[in-house]
From Swiss-Prot:
One GO CC term, this protein: ribosome
Domain of life: Bacteria
Family: Belongs to the universal ribosomal protein uL23 family.
One annotated GO biological process: translation
Molecular functions (GO terms): rRNA binding; structural constituent of ribosome
Record InterPro entries: Nucleotide-bd_a/b_plait_sf (IPR012677), Ribosomal_uL23-like (IPR013025), Ribosomal_uL23/eL15/eS24_sf (IPR012678)
Purpose of the protein: One of the early assembly proteins it binds 23S rRNA. One of the proteins that surrounds the polypeptide exit tunnel on the outside of the ribosome. Forms the main docking site for trigger factor binding to the ribosome.
Binding partners and assembly: Part of the 50S ribosomal subunit. Contacts protein L29, and trigger factor when it is bound to the ribosome.
Keyword rRNA-binding: yes
UniProtKB keywords: Ribonucleoprotein, Ribosomal protein, RNA-binding, rRNA-binding
Entries under Pfam families matching the protein: Ribosomal_L23 (PF00276)
Name of this chain's protein: Large ribosomal subunit protein uL23
Matching SUPFAM superfamilies: Ribosomal proteins S24e, L23 and L15e
Length: 93
């Protein structure tokens, strides 16, 4: 069972702000969270069931730091279709 703490943040980018107007929330989570676990988190903590959930893994970019190769952290993000009238004030959206 996933916990509310597995949701790291809501992503605020130009694309995600445009999607928010259409009722889609973009959430960054731990890499081991599944769609069904995220659905249970929304049911338990926010009181509604998402209409649709899409997921993707974002691999960390390989970057140079002081002449050596390093890699940014990889993460998983979900596009969550929220029903009309549902509120998720606990996450700040």
């Amino acid at each position: 069972m996933a916990d509310i703490m597995d949701i790291k943040s809501i992503l605020y980018t130009e694309k995600s702000l445009g999607l928010q107007e259409k009722g889609v929330l973009v959430v960054q989570t731990a890499q081991n969270v599944t769609k069904n676990q995220l659905k249970e988190v929304f049911k338990t903590y926010f009181g509604f069931e998402p209409l649709k959930i899409n997921s993707l893994k974002q691999e960390g970019k390989v970057k140079r730091f002081r002449g050596k190769l390093g890699q940014r952290k990889s993460f998983k993000k979900f596009y969550v279709k929220v029903p009309e009238g549902a509120s998720i004030a606990a996450l700040g959206a």
